[in-house]
Swiss-Prot record:
Superkingdom of source: Eukaryota
Pfam entry (one): Histone
PTM annotation (PolyADP-ribosyl glutamic acid): residues: E36
Lineage, uppermost ranks: Eukaryota, Metazoa, Chordata, Craniata, Vertebrata
Modified residues (N-acetylproline): P2
Biased composition (Low complexity): 1-12
Assigned protein family: Belongs to the histone H2B family.
Source organism of this protein record: Pongo abelii
Self-association state and partner proteins as the record states: The nucleosome is a histone octamer containing two molecules each of H2A, H2B, H3 and H4 assembled in one H3-H4 heterotetramer and two H2A-H2B heterodimers. The octamer wraps approximately 147 bp of DNA.
Modified residues (N6-(beta-hydroxybutyryl)lysine): K6, K12, K21, K35, K117
Gene responsible for this protein: H2BC21
GO annotations of cellular component type: nucleosome; nucleus
Protein name, as recorded: Histone H2B type 2-E
Amino acid sequence: MPEPAKSAPAPKKGSKKAVTKAQKKDGKKRKRSCKESYSIYVYKVLKQVHPDTGISSKAMGIMNSFVNDIFERIAGEASRLAHYNKRSTITSREIQTAVRLLLPGELAKHAVSEGTKAVTKYTSSK
């Protein structure tokens, strides 16, 4: 009986030959997809508040995570409010109510006033 054909030995774990760069058929490197984050906006606000202060990449990651978390909470609460009131659109009113429900006391007041200011600025620029 003939023996089964043996395949070529697998490359060793530390082998450098196994590592190849991702390339398209025409030989050009593939562009990495951008990971969306709020880092440029966090940095702009930091420079407005403390112009001479920097931020580490670890701290920026934490800030990005924080902004994503707050965004999801507000969006979820606004969605629930729209659903309760049998509305299919989330308006600035739902966002404002969601902010009042989620943020404590003085922080909610400041957030609402800043949000109102931003919406006014946007509508006047149209």
